[in-house]
Amino acid sequence: MPRLVAYLLANDKKMIELEVNSVASLIEVSRSAFQGFGKTVHWFRGQTSAAWGLVPTVHRDYDQAGEHNLAAHFRLSASTRHTKAPDLSDLSAWMSLMQHFGLPTRLLDWTASPLVALYFALDSEPHTKAAAVWGLVPSRLNAVSAFKAEETFVLSGPEARPLLLAGMSRGPVVEDVLAVVAQDIDLRMTLQQGAFTLHGTSAPLNERPGANGYLAKFIIPQSAREQIKEELWFLGIRRSGLFPDLANLALELTTDQRRTPRRRVV
């Protein structure tokens, strides 16, 4: 711990970037890294490649016209496929729904749980590379936004509306990023302790000026992936607990049977 504190003090002008090799080490270094921010909320995001920046899918793969087309077609077609489709004017509800069902949006998923973030960092390909868990202080991000407010915003609130309009209704471009929370639309979002950053720009969040004031990066080397996955399994951080449907329960049970082939579920 003293060596970690010395590192943090020596690098206070740079974004914190530390390697973790176990669940315990992530808890230790993240608590130490965020100590200087006081008793405030922290969010985490797992990414399967440590080389990836913090950019939503829609900004990686689409221009603004493409983003508008995706949103428009989804909203027009959803009412016959989803019995609880929001009113067409409720942009925040539509943005949450699009994100929930996997449409590329200007939202990035975060979680209040570092263990949930670790699960997503290690859950999918590429397994041969280092993964990462990002840490964020949402109130500090919003403090350097256009609103200069050290608090967490609501996706349905006035602060987020200009960014929603830009993505869904051909409003003017707003090159800002906000940390927002939204109403839980199903049990999955509750179990994953979900939150979001809302991006009005394709510039990676980690490359924005002042990112060291609200971001930290914890790198998981390839050599530690399997050990950490075993630790998460032991701690009960499993797929069916984060995706509470029968398809994911079946996938988890199948995986568990492969893990312990002689065990039988009676």
Regions found by a protein language model. Name each.
Residues 1-266:
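Catalytic-core elements of nucleic-acid end-processing and repair enzymes
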